Amino acid sequence: MARELFRTPIWRLDKFIEDQLLPDTTFLTELRADIDSISAFLMERCFQGAAHPVRVSRVVMGGCYNEYTVLKGRSEANMVVFLINLTSFEDQFNGQVVFIEEIWRHLLQLQQEKLCKLKFEVQSPKEPNSRFLSFKLSCPERQHELEFDVQPAYDALYEVRHFKPFDSSNYNKVYAQLTHECTTLEKEGEFSICFTDLHQSFLRYRAPKLWNLIRLVKHWYQLCKEKLRGPLPPQYALELLTVYVWEYGIHENPGLHTAQCFRTVLELVTKYKRLRIYWTWCYDFQHEISDYLQGQIKKARPLILDPADPTRNVAGSDLQAWDLLAKEAQIWIDSTFFTNHDMSIVEAWEVMPERQECVFL
């Protein structure tokens, strides 16, 4: 697959995405149906008859599962099981082992009842009292597989998620609680799944061309994982870099060339030591968390703040992982891959790796 991308003429990148990266529509239809069945099953069965008041309020897909940017082939995603009658992020952390065990028990029952159209396999926890649980939905005939990490979560947005129109001030109280608990518990960035709805909204109303560009970057990232065999920065960091490049390009270059976008993302990867990117969308410097946010953007780089969780630096702290990916990005930049049919070179846009003022576009 790496050769297929590398050998693709740069002016045919859009065609490559369409032919090689877009998922099979039949698989997507069956996947949505199975996810609905699993979600309904968990909402109906989990914690029924339990002495405590915790119940499943809803189930939301997150992580790399996104109907706008999901890839053909093998992918990973999150299934977030939101719980009501928790009162804090700390409640989520303290009860996670119990919640995981309950959900695992019912997923095994669902597997036995064979209600899914796709092949459904629950993975056994790797150790007793595990905080991790996963299952797979696959279609071997179409060579599609999606592995889900199941994560129970405090439904922090339960009371505000339906407010229309979108107004970031609705989240002031939630973010004040989040930053206080995260700093007290020393768990910054560990509750980002509670904001899965906002992660989805961040991409939902974007242009389809951006979704396809994210698919291309995700595909390149997977090729790097296969080749380099070492730890790499989180994939979501690359997705956010892609959004950042897009937001710049939509102003400067209304025509938006896929190859230029892609090259610019790779150029930013090579400048990882200077990255400081954040969005003032769900939170900003007018909120109660202004002082906290000021401290966040002064921290060591690379810094890519989660647009829905100001406590989470999506870039992580592994500089060796970034260095490994940056070297691979430079190999692609220096290669003939970005050569046009007239032998000219596709140039990157001059996008600053540090953003002075960020807004949601």
From Swiss-Prot:
It comes from the Eukaryota. InterPro entries: 2-5-oligoAdlate_synth_1_dom2/C (IPR018952), NT_sf (IPR043519). It is found in: Cytoplasm. Induction: Unlike other OAS1 proteins, not induced by polyinosinic:polycytidylic acid (poly I:C). SUPFAM superfamilies: Nucleotidyltransferase (SSF81301), PAP/OAS1 substrate-binding domain (SSF81631). Interacts with OAS1A, the interaction inhibits OAS1A catalytic activity. One of its GO terms (molecular function) is enzyme inhibitor activity. Disruption phenotype: Newborn mice are viable. Female mice display reduced fertility due to deficiencies in ovarian follicle development, reduced efficiency of ovulation, and the arrest of fertilized eggs at one-cell stage. One of its GO terms (biological process) is ovarian follicle development. Does not have 2'-5'-oligoadenylate synthetase activity, but can bind double-stranded RNA. May play a role in the control of female fertility, possibly by binding to and inhibiting OAS1A. The keyword Cytoplasm applies. Belongs to the 2-5A synthase family. The keyword Membrane does not apply. PANTHER family: 2'-5' OLIGOADENYLATE SYNTHETASE 1E-RELATED, 2-5 OLIGOADENYLATE SYNTHETASE. It comes from Mus musculus (Mouse). One of its GO terms (cellular component) is cytoplasm. Expressed specifically in oocytes (at protein level). Expressed at highest level in ovary with lesser amounts in intestine, brain, thymus lung, kidney, liver and uterus. This is Inactive 2'-5'-oligoadenylate synthase 1D. Keywords: Cytoplasm, RNA-binding. Its main location: cytoplasm.
